[in-house]
């Protein structure tokens, strides 16, 4: 059968490698200077080294399969159409969730992903706004590096979305490093040095102020904007990974594998 010319956008290593192994010509576009996307960032917190090993193994596999990798390339609809691909796999991932909260766009507030990537450097005393898995892993990393860390979370339990075994280890690390936990905290307003929040149990307003840095880690939302533009150009598009829904890495990898087998 005819070799299909496929294009994987924004670092979907698994789909690219498997598709190429199955005989397709694959171009992998990545806007960043390195492959790995959010998986690479996820490997930075304590105990997540095996994720980096997995990313490296997929990079090697893609290279051996003959995937053409183009780094530092912003995927624009017109440029993609000019390459005349038979299929396009869009894996643009997820972007930080920015809720309509007063002050959330304050320039002084750091993004969690930027902290993990080494693009932003928090001060000594840090407030993490958001205590899900990502926020807690950032808190754990900063605490191990010697920062004084406080985590404010809307839910009653921090890291409620983590696997139980991993959460237990995280809580032990929090206790060891003196990480302060503020649960049931619905953030109402951001300041450069902290937040105002409502206790969801009592309805009372409180402030957490006086921090050197505030790090935003309130979750992610699927980034599917590119696929919509490509579809309007009449290009066959498949959306995978966090571009469909922000979720666990294992789920995104399984989806990428299943798609690569079908194409």
Where are these regions (language model features)?
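Short glycine/serine/threonine-rich phosphate/pyrophosphate-binding segments
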Residues: 12-15, 109, 135-138
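A conserved FAD-binding loop/helix module that cradles the flavin
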Residues: 136-138, 157-166, 238-263
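A Rossmann-like FAD-binding core segment of flavoenzymes
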Residues: 52-98, 104-124, 144-229
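Short, small-residue-biased leader/transition segments that mark boundaries at the very start
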Residues: 2-9
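Gly/Ala-rich phosphate-binding loop of Rossmann-like dinucleotide-binding domains
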Residues: 16-21, 139-144, 231
């Amino acid at each position: 059968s005819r070799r299909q010319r496929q294009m994987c956008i924004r670092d979907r290593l698994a789909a690219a490698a498997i598709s190429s192994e199955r005989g397709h010509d694959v171009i992998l576009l990545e806007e960043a200077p390195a492959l790995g996307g959010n998986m690479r960032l996820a490997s930075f917190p304590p105990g997540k080294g095996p994720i980096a090993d997995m990313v490296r193994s997929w990079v090697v596999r893609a290279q051996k399969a003959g995937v053409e990798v183009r780094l530092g390339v912003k995927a624009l609809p017109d440029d993609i159409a000019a390459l005349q691909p038979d299929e396009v796999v869009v894996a643009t991932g997820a972007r930080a969730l920015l809720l309509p909260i007063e002050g959330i766009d304050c320039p002084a507030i750091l993004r969690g992903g930027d902290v993990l990537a080494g693009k932003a450097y928090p001060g000594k005393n840090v407030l993490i706004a958001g205590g899900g898995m990502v926020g807690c892993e950032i808190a754990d990393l900063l605490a191990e590096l010697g920062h004084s860390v406080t985590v404010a979370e809307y839910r009653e339990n921090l890291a409620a979305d983590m696997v139980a075994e991993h959460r237990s280890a995280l809580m032990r690390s929090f206790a060891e490093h003196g990480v302060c936990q503020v649960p049931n905290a619905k953030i109402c307003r951001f300041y450069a040095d902290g937040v105002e929040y409502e206790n969801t149990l009592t309805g009372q307003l409180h402030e957490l102020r006086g921090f050197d840095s505030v790090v935003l880690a309130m979750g992610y939302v699927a980034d599917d904007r590119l696929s919509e533009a490509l579809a309007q150009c009449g290009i066959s598009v498949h959306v995978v990974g966090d571009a469909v829904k922000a979720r666990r890495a294992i789920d995104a990898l399984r989806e990428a594998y299943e798609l690569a087998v079908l194409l």
